[in-house]
């Protein structure tokens, strides 16, 4: 909502902006648990964005199976980008367990070393069926923005800053090709010590401020 109501949004040339999803819950279109439902309600329905610029992940009502949904979305991506897949920005929320997209700690998905869209049938966080980018596909973004807010995310943020283990803490090792930024509120940043030795690359950055 804060983004939707920002005065600069009215000046964005929306016909030149394409929207893709890095993960989605495999539920019917319009289900309140789907990420795209919130995106439409919070932003996309409020600006003149061409329908062909909005690339939703398949839904359980539209795809034949979860596996077909993963293949279909990967086909859409390769049809759009060819062999040179490059997203401008990938915005990722950080989970309390330091997961990003639907890449959960110690799962098989975090070990996949090629760029692709995966079908997840056993997510530890409901619903179990999801579609997700692999980490290598996420990292074909020029910028990766990681967003965390609230005290419940403080441990995850501390992991991101002090370790580099893509299996145990997937968010700790995801990088944009040009820039990686952590956007934090004060509660999420509470465990970061200014003089702490961190594994987070010096050329990356984190921004801590109150936001809504």
Model-derived features: where do they sit?
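ATP/nucleoside-binding phosphotransfer catalytic cores, i.e., glycine-rich phosphate-binding loops
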Residues: 136, 142-212
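Ligand-binding beta-strand-loop-alpha-helix segment within the catalytic cores
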Residues: 10-88, 202-205, 210-211
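Short beta-strand segments
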Residues: 21, 57-58, 90-94, 146-149, ...
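Short acidic/glycine-rich loop or secondary-structure boundary segments that cap or lie
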Residues: 28-30, 64-65, 97-104, 110-112, ...
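Class I SAM-dependent methyltransferase SAM-binding "motif I" and its flanking Rossmann-like core
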Residues: 90-136
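Short, conserved loop/helix-junction motifs that constitute active-site signature segments
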Residues: 9-18, 47-49, 109-111, 136-141, ...
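A glycine- and small-aliphatic-rich helix-loop capping segment at beta-alpha/alpha-beta transitions
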Residues: 2-13, 37-41, 105-114
């Amino acid at each position: 909502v804060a983004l939707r109501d920002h005065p600069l949004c009215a000046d964005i040339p929306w016909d030149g902006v394409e929207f893709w999803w890095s993960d989605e819950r495999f539920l019917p279109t319009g289900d309140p648990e789907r990420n795209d439902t919130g995106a439409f309600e919070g932003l996309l329905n409020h600006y003149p964005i061409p329908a062909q610029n909005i690339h939703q992940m398949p839904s359980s009502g539209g795809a034949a199976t979860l596996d077909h949904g993963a293949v279909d979305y990967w086909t859409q991506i390769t049809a759009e980008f060819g062999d040179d897949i490059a997203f401008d920005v990938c915005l990722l929320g950080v989970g309390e367990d330091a997961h990003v997209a639907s890449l959960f700690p110690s799962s098989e998905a975090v070990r996949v070393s090629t760029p692709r869209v995966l079908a997840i049938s056993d997510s530890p966080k409901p619903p179990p069926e999801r579609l997700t980018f692999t980490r290598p596909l996420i990292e074909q973004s020029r910028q990766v923005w990681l967003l965390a807010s609230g005290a419940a995310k403080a441990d995850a943020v501390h992991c991101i800053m002090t370790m580099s283990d893509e299996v145990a803490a997937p968010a700790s090792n995801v990088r944009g090709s040009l820039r990686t930024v952590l956007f934090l509120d004060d509660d999420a940043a509470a465990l970061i010590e200014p003089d702490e030795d961190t594994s987070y690359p010096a050329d990356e950055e984190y921004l801590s401020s109150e936001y809504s």
